[in-house]
């Protein structure tokens, strides 16, 4: 696939997924848990689109290096998310 076409498809897919997430949040009467589940689904799909279309994940000859980079990014993301949640919960419980 041509680079310009690939970037255009990725950009449009990202915009569509973002608009769908906003629509689900603002204009549906689903339960909160259902909304969160759907938004997380859109987020994971959008992360895959970003990795495949913009980060050139499939264009390397050395698959081991790409795998290491993706695993490292996942670990850093999990540390950031879990650490943020932990700090927020600790701050919230100390103010009650």
UniProtKB/Swiss-Prot annotation:
Q: Which Pfam families match?
A: COX4_pro
Query: What is the reaction catalyzed?
Result: 2 a quinol + O2 = 2 a quinone + 2 H2O
Q: Where in the cell is it found?
A: Cell membrane
- InterPro entries membership: Cyt_c_oxidase_su4_prok, Cytochrome_c_oxidase_bac_sub4, QoxD
Give the E.C. number(s).
Answer: 1.10.3.-
Any one cellular-component term (Gene Ontology): plasma membrane
Q: Which GO terms describe its molecular function?
A: cytochrome bo3 ubiquinol oxidase activity; oxidoreductase activity, acting on diphenols and related substances as donors, oxygen as acceptor; proton transmembrane transporter activity
| Catalytic EC class | oxidoreductase
Name the GO terms of the biological process aspect. aerobic electron transport chain; ATP synthesis coupled electron transport; electron transport coupled proton transport
Q: Tell me the keywords, alphabetical order.
A: Cell membrane, Membrane, Oxidoreductase, Transmembrane, Transmembrane helix
Note the topology in the membrane: Multi-pass membrane protein
According to the record, the segments passing through the membrane are 8-28, 36-56, 68-88
Primary location group: membrane
Q: What's this protein's family per the entry?
A: Belongs to the cytochrome c oxidase bacterial subunit 4 family.
* Record's function text: Catalyzes quinol oxidation with the concomitant reduction of oxygen to water.
What's the protein called, per UniProt? Probable quinol oxidase subunit 4
Supply the source organism for this entry: Staphylococcus saprophyticus subsp. saprophyticus (strain ATCC 15305 / DSM 20229 / NCIMB 8711 / NCTC 7292 / S-41)
User: What is this protein's gene name?
Assistant: qoxD
């Amino acid at each position: 696939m041509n680079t310009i076409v690939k970037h255009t498809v990725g950009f449009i897919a990202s915009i569509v997924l973002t608009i769908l997430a906003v629509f689900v949040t603002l204009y549906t009467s689903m339960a909160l848990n259902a909304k969160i589940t759907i938004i997380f689904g859109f987020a994971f799909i959008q992360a895959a689109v970003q990795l495949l279309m913009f980060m050139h994940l499939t264009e390397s000859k050395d698959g081991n290096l790409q795998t290491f980079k993706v695993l490292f990014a996942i670990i850093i993301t999990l540390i950031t998310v879990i650490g943020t949640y932990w700090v927020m919960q600790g701050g919230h419980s100390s103010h009650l």
